């Protein structure tokens, strides 16, 4: 028979969420490490390098799905995401975006270090000899307009969600996802049409690392927005509780800003 003291001990007396033990952080770390190993093997043309990279990336996406499933269950169905918990989550997302900014800062540092003082090995000029750079006013400029437009549509969705305009929220978020897919398609087409590759010296390595890493962030942001669209259609995002979408929107605006720096620095200035 349950006594009153036992019930009192089982009642949570604080607004914080004590997360249950989860395997996903450890498994995600293993998948990310495997992706790095597979990427290095693929770049150096090792046997099965592309296979390891593909399998590791698929496993990473699967872990993202299962981890988000647990977080959504804890927030939407179990009610663990109180106001204080959401404040902590917002702070965590801000720190995550800051760490991503530092990541891209390293790529820009490598690019400007090589372009502002080109060495004799590449002809003491920038772009290096033998590199046919891409025209910044073709696909890159079109992709810039697409990403800027997607930033407008995701802001439209946020304002519609706060104003409880459900139909506009669904429409604007759907348009954002479509624009993201179009951007990724054009980026892949641009890669296929480029005359230089990742192994073509410092220009190719800095170009593909910076733009490719940004493309990976676009893919992650697209998946995040797609999850938000599914949750919005299932009435899991409301006028008062929509932190999942809010964090995805922050992330998407970060992707927009990074692309503007990439376009101005690498495509426009770096290719002139």
Swiss-Prot record:
This is Cytochrome c oxidase subunit 3. InterPro entries: Cyt_c/ubiquinol_Oxase_su3, Cyt_c_oxase_su3_dom, Cyt_c_oxidase-like_su3, Cyt_c_oxidase_su3-like_sf, Cyt_c_oxidase_su3_a-hlx. One of its GO terms (cellular component) is mitochondrial inner membrane. Belongs to the cytochrome c oxidase subunit 3 family. Component of the cytochrome c oxidase (complex IV, CIV), a multisubunit enzyme composed of a catalytic core of 3 subunits and several supernumerary subunits. The complex exists as a monomer or a dimer and forms supercomplexes (SCs) in the inner mitochondrial membrane with ubiquinol-cytochrome c oxidoreductase (cytochrome b-c1 complex, complex III, CIII). Keywords: Membrane, Mitochondrion, Mitochondrion inner membrane, Translocase, Transmembrane, Transmembrane helix. It is a multi-pass membrane protein. It catalyses: 4 Fe(II)-[cytochrome c] + O2 + 8 H(+)(in) = 4 Fe(III)-[cytochrome c] + 2 H2O + 4 H(+)(out). PROSITE patterns: COX3. It holds the Pfam family COX3. GO terms for molecular function: cytochrome-c oxidase activity. The gene is COX3. CDD domains: Cyt_c_Oxidase_III (cd01665). Its EC number is 7.1.1.9. The chain crosses the membrane at residues 23-43, 45-65, 91-111, 137-157, 169-189, 210-230, 249-269. Component of the cytochrome c oxidase, the last enzyme in the mitochondrial electron transport chain which drives oxidative phosphorylation. The respiratory chain contains 3 multisubunit complexes succinate dehydrogenase (complex II, CII), ubiquinol-cytochrome c oxidoreductase (cytochrome b-c1 complex, complex III, CIII) and cytochrome c oxidase (complex IV, CIV), that cooperate to transfer electrons derived from NADH and succinate to molecular oxygen, creating an electrochemical gradient over the inner membrane that drives transmembrane transport and the ATP synthase. GO terms for biological process: mitochondrial electron transport, cytochrome c to oxygen. It comes from the Eukaryota. It is found in: Mitochondrion inner membrane.
